[in-house]
């Protein structure tokens, strides 16, 4: 039998190829106690971009480990569903800078309606607003004054 560390390594290697036949393994792995396994499986589900995984990715976006949350946000970006957009917007308020940045870039890359971005920019969370502003500046090559 293969231990969880090795499974995670293998999943990380094959995930970009989008093999749907491993979907069940990925789904089950998102509930693992092993952080590396959760990260690998959430990323793998993101590569599959199956709307059926929306709930799983939204749940992973609230994981205790920031790397899992960040991977979930990138997966939600690929879904682009209304719930995924809302999940990405919520992640701009994450306590971890890296997750806020991933969410900000994901929100912009999702080609959402400008009102979705304005919601974050005009919201009460300064850090969320700053993350989106920074991502906007970077995505259109504007210079900050």
Segments the model singles out, each with a brief description of its role:
Residues 4-5, 35-36, 51, 66-67, ...:
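Alpha-helix N-cap/helix-start positions at coil->helix boundaries
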Residues 66-112:
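Ankyrin-repeat and related helical/solenoid repeat scaffolds used for protein-protein interactions
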Residues 13-16, 44-47, 75-78, 106-109, ...:
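Core register positions within helices of long alpha-helical scaffolds
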Residues 1-16, 22, 27, 34-35, ...:
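Alpha-solenoid helical repeat scaffolds
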Residues 10, 41, 72, 103, ...:
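Conserved hydrophobic register position within alpha-solenoid helical repeats
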Residues 1, 18-31, 50-62, 81-93, ...:
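Amphipathic alpha-helical scaffolding segments comprising HEAT/armadillo-like alpha-solenoid repeats
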